[in-house]
């Protein structure tokens, strides 16, 4: 009799997504380019007096000064932070607690206690 174990699962192949987070270069705005090109090549006064309609395919464009500048290079990778030096290892003794001073303190404290 054949074993009734589970069949191994097949992994589906995954497609890589297109890199959509990069900006597509857009052509520069040329809203009035049709008007200036027809008026400069034409010599009749009637064509310059009537402006040609703006084509609907050009749509709206953001002014050049208001656009977000494109990054030409990637910013540098973040640097690893330096490990803080362990202060306990480098701690030096405080000069106030030098052995002669400590002994004098206790002698003075014991003398005050005996006088009471």
From Swiss-Prot:
Compositional bias ranges of the Basic residues kind: 1-22
Role played: Probable cyclin-dependent protein kinase (CDK) inhibitor that functions as a repressor of mitosis in the endoreduplication cell cycle.
Source organism phylogeny: Eukaryota, Viridiplantae, Streptophyta, Embryophyta, Tracheophyta
GO terms classed as biological process: regulation of DNA endoreduplication
Keywords from the UniProt entry: Cell cycle, Protein kinase inhibitor
Molecular-function annotations in GO: protein kinase inhibitor activity
Alphabetized InterPro entries for the sequence: SMR
Gene: SMR9
Keyword Cell cycle: yes
Name the record gives this protein: Cyclin-dependent protein kinase inhibitor SMR9
Residue segments, region Disordered: 1-62
Biased composition (Low complexity): 35-56
Keyword Cell cycle appears in the UniProt entry: yes
């Amino acid at each position: 009799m054949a074993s009734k174990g589970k069949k191994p699962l097949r992994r589906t192949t995954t497609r890589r997504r297109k890199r959509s987070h990069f900006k597509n270069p857009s052509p520069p705005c040329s809203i009035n380019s049709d008007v200036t090109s027809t008026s400069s090549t034409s010599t009749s006064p009637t064509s310059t007096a009537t402006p040609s309609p703006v084509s609907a395919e050009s749509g709206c464009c953001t002014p050049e000064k208001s656009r977000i500048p494109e990054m030409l290079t990637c910013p540098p990778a973040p640097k690893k932070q330096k490990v803080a030096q362990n202060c306990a290892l480098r701690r030096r003794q405080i000069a106030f607690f030098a052995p002669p001073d400590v002994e004098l303190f206790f002698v003075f404290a014991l003398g005050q206690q005996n006088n009471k």
